[in-house]
Amino acid sequence: MDDAGEIHALGGSLRREASSARSGDAAVFFSRSSSRDEDDEEALRWAALEKLPTYDRARTAVLAMPEGELREVNVQRLGPQERHALLQRLAWVGDDHARFLSKFKDRVDRVGIELPTIEVRYENLNVEAEAYVGSRGLPTILNTYANVLEGLANTLHITPNRKQKISILHNVSGIIKPHRMTLLLGPPGAGKTTLLLALAGNVPSGLKVSGQITYNGHTMDEFEPRRSAAYVSQHDLHMGELTVRETVNFSAKCQGIGHRYDLLMELSRREKEENIKPDPEVDIYLKAAATGEQKAEVVTNHILKVLGLDICADTIVGNNMLRGISGGQKKRVTTAEMIVTPGRALFMDEISTGLDSSTTYNIVDSIRQTIHIVGGTAVIALLQPAPETYELFDDIILLSDGQVVYNGPREHVLEFFESVGFKCPERKGVADFLQEVTSRKDQRQYWMHGDETYRYVPVKEFAEAFQSFHVGQAIRSELAIPFDKSRSHPAALKTSKYGASMKELLKANIDREILLMKRNSFVYIFKATQLTLMTFIAMTVFIRTNMHHDSITNGGIYMGALFFGILMIMFNGLAEVGLTIAKLPVFFKQRDLLFYPAWTYSLPSWIIKTPLSLLNVTIWVFITYYVIGFDPNVERLFRQFLLLLVMNETSSGLFRFIAGFARHQVVASTMGSFCILIFMLLGGFILSRENVKKWWIWGYWISPLMYAQNAISVNEFLGHSWNKTIPGFREPLGKLVLESRGVFPEAKWYWIGVGALLGYVLLFNILYTICLTFLNPFDSNQPTISEETLKIKQANLTGDVIEASSRGRITTNTNTADDSNDEAISNHATVNSSPGKKGMVLPFVPLSITFEDIRYSVDMPEVIKAQGVTESRLELLKGISGSFRPGVLTALMGVSGAGKTTLMDVLAGRKTSGYIEGNITISGYPKKQETFARVSGYCEQNDIHSPNVTVYESLAFSAWLRLPAEIDSATRKMFIDEVMELVELSPLKDSLVGLPGVSGLSTEQRKRLTIAVELVANPSIIFMDEPTSGLDARAAAIVMRAIRNTVDTGRTVVCTIHQPSIDIFESFDELFLMKRGGEEIYVGPVGQHSCELIRYFESIEGVSKIKHGYNPSTWMLEVTSTVQEQITGVNFSEIYKNSELYRRNKSMIKELSSPPDGSSDLSFPTEYSQTFITQCLACLWKQSLSYWRNPPYTAVKYFYTIVIALLFGTMFWGVGRKRSNQQDLFNAMGSMYASVLFMGVQNSSSVQPVVSVERTVFYRERAAHMYSPLPYALGQVAIELPYILVQSLIYGVLVYAMIGFEWTAAKFFWYLFFMYFTLSYYTFYGMMSVGLTPSYNVASVVSTAFYAIWNLFSGFIIPRTRIPIWWRWYYWVCPVAWTLYGLVTSQFGDVTDTFDNGVRISDFVESYFGYHRDFLWVVAVMVVSFAVLFAFLFGLSIKIFNFQKR
């Protein structure tokens, strides 16, 4: 057998290798049994089929067509009608999964085929990380530079390594057996993810691993573990533009789904020998899944059915800015993507996040059926498994603080803990008990010896006790006897690295790249439109009626036109940076899981986009060539076309390489600007070859722009139009123009240039492939930890007990290091079981909210319209009514897609699109969003926070802006401390928040922060969207304790919630239950032990009674599911609306919809809690912290500035002192032009992703009415000013001195002045472009056009005096033109020295450029004005536009 697919009932893939001959179940999971009687015709066809040779029999099947006809078909060559009939017939496979698996197993057993199995052993496994301890680990600018220098010194063995070792897994051992389901449990930071990664052979490179892991006795270097096992990550990384079906289908193609040929041949051969007739539906499924073009589609359809994804199969996955499937559906896509792999062992990390308990149960049950029937191996980590889900598992692994506390059969786990003095209470879920019993804070409540004094039992004692327990002894005895390798099935372990042929992998990537191009077509259409606009501008600026072939000066203008064309084509590739980096996280995941080699990914990204290059170059060349007046020769036209085409491919390859090397948007933008700078400076146009310093001449020879400039210039100036002489010269004019610009005047340089550029195309794409092959993601998670937490971890390893200290501080990256903060939390002052009202002492007004007949609809999606639906709108909420009251905790529940989050968004006023109908009142008064936002809080499902501030700073910022202005800072600080105590965040107060899934806080810590951010606002009504999603049982209990405490203060709290445990569910007072389609089916009290809820549903005919000890929430979701409605013929919505409960609720709504006597409507004297000045100060404070701790932006910017300054200084060394001729002046001006262009573009492009990330946080904070848009914009603008000042000083001092401009105070400070405000307006322009566009990628593309236009009209490529009169107006609105005006005039506008020809420099500046010295102060005002204008437009765009669609 070759598949994890079997393992999950989802499909396998038997390789066509000799070792696979005996394998067998791969197709297993996708077929449904049919008990239909065979008629005579079918019997005759089968008789004929059995006479065929094995080879033909494996490809031929009997297919029932929709009209009833039985047709003998070759599954490798199906027509469209037959293909459709086959897929329709097999659509039922997922509905009877266990029966299908049993039929398959019976079939292989009958012919004696043995299915392969894997036993995984791990012995003395240790995993360590290295981390900086304390504040040194924070990513500040100074720490970043210090770390780089220290790392270099460590490499050279100059200084010792100051990082401390952190133990993640400590000496763990165990056995994971086939045919058994293993549940992995443990508190946050226990090391669960690291253990799963280690067992799957996918440990991050930064970790040190020792010990041994074997599969069937084979060490990991004897086979390919990443194909023999499948690892399902807890992070949902997908390409948002693809649909669910396309995402899973791509994985199926890459992982070898459909390669079941060997199994099929062996089955057919043995069945023919023994005259066995297989089940016809199992037979056709196996054949369809093993051969033919539909094989991956068959497998994909089955997986989608089993995981309940068939209802959203054709919906795009979506991302932060692209609306797609729900979070729970996305989690299932992550599972589906991996369970089609050929691995026989499954390691699944937190696959239930965002799923309701019934969905989790169904998925785990499907996996269990596969494991038990076909013999797979599975370890699944779950956060809050319901008791019925827990019962599906055979074995338990309990980890705590990197040590195995228990590993063995589920039925003995409670026996073990009772042997050490701890007992699980009767109504406590065993999984919840196991999560909490090793925790210092929660352990005491489970102590069973009331007559003995309790003492805390550390993890080490549990681990040692387990070694003495009979289960631990049995494991140790079994590990002492090595696994007999001869028992390992030859098909169990994979030795080939990839699951499909290179041709198939390349085709899969090509198909996906074409799909992505279609979905991102807006970007490419926009680029083409933008290029067309630039073409129009260029041909009207360099129009032939104004340009002549009669002088060297005019030749220089033509040279500028050619140079501008090359620049436009080169800048056109800049958008590749953003598009490439956006896809890298998914690529790295798929590369590490061996979906495909890097070259099959990089090649399509190059080849498939070549037609776009053809289109872009065609637009440019064929529109501009004759209008500008280039040499009218068709051959030279096509030569220019060929050259620019190759140049476009070079540019795209260069920027893809930069993106692949940098792997970070800001760093890549900086590197891209740097490369453009080097290539342009040394390309021969800005600085001619004769003027390039000897120490930089090598750069001239390696610049792609040099070869392009030489080739395109030779092609033009050796043409007929320039083959004329002018007075005073014997050589042709074209050759004179070439020589004046330092270009080689020989025809061969055209082909030299084309050849060199083709070489660069290959080189850059090869380098890009190499980067993708060998480099890891940019954020290679470097964990940091506080000294106190490190001591606690070390104490847990040694069994010591340390005293609690006043405050713990942790900064941890759970994704890599799994640092445990559990004990650090427990060391802090204990939170009582009901500290509730403490910490909620600030006064507030209790408020109720009622809503009646709420309807919400959206425009009908095009995908659904394409299926024949004629309605213009899709209704998501259908007349919902209810009320939420003070002091009452309400659970908003329903299966995925029921509309829970939609209803909450509507009530909270968070919807930005769609159509809302119905009435909402707040304590009897109509809801007004402006005032409602002041008294309400909203905890979003996605925990959105500024990544570069600490936990305490996040809370301080929220409290500062949302609490009333009359509350003084001391009271506010006290309140923040109390809220942190309430949600147990005090030990994490100095932890950096970080980015989800990348750095900083763990999922559950981030969730508690989200709640705390709302609590510090002291709201009357709080909405919480899945506050326990992604948390383990203990963390969920902490969160629920905080929520319960909040409710007990008299607040109104509503929570959507998935898969709650019995404890959590019964902590709610009322339940608002919805069914799929947006209708309520129960709105009422939960009752003691859920008695009210159970009584209501059990009174409905056809509803099964709840079993003793069963989770009421799980039972409720099961009995009200759509499937049960169909089975029982019950419409729960109609029953509810005809019930007494509904009438009581309507009466309550009516009562609460009338204002109480003596009450008044909500009103506030001001729109926001704080004054405008306070809002500005708060926003500036947060931005200052964010910038200081964002070294990829700030530290890289300064490093880039220093490097660029040194490059400019050495390239233009001393040109400021040379004034012999006009070329000397042009060289000096070139240094100014290049510095303005490149430093400015770098500032603009690097600030865009920073603003884009913060804008997502801004949307949440603005919706909460924390501040108005203007203070946010002012804070973002103001924080840049000091950083730009430092940048200007660094650059200005270095460059001014090295270039050798005149050392007078006035000229020096004028130079600094213009550089400072130029960098400012470029930076503010970058911010503005993000504010005006929906995403960073669009902003990047739009900006490229403006950079090009500013470049053209700057006055360097073509001076103002030569710009056509109809375009001269734009010169005056081009900010770069004003900058160059100011720089040149301030340095040379008053110089009375003369050139060699006797012309005074100041006169030449005035006559040639049109620069007047007495206009300098006006120029200065204009440059400042542009900075102010762009900053103002950024603020205006932030205020007006909201691109977040909800």
From Swiss-Prot:
PROSITE patterns: ABC_TRANSPORTER_2
SMART domains named among the record's database cross-references: AAA
Membrane-traversing stretches: 523-543, 555-575, 610-630, 641-661, 666-686, 752-772, 1195-1215, 1225-1242, 1281-1301, 1308-1328, 1338-1358, 1363-1383, 1415-1435
Domain ABC transmembrane type-2: from-to ranges: 504-717, 1174-1388
Record: residues binding ATP 2: G894, V895, S896, G897, A898, G899, K900, T901
UniProt binding sites for ATP 1: G186, P187, P188, G189, A190, G191, K192, T193
Membrane topology: Multi-pass membrane protein
The keyword ATP-binding belongs to this UniProt entry's keyword annotation: yes
Family membership: Belongs to the ABC transporter superfamily. ABCG family. PDR (TC 3.A.1.205) subfamily.
Protein name in UniProt: ABC transporter G family member 53
Taxonomic source organism: Oryza sativa subsp. japonica (Rice)
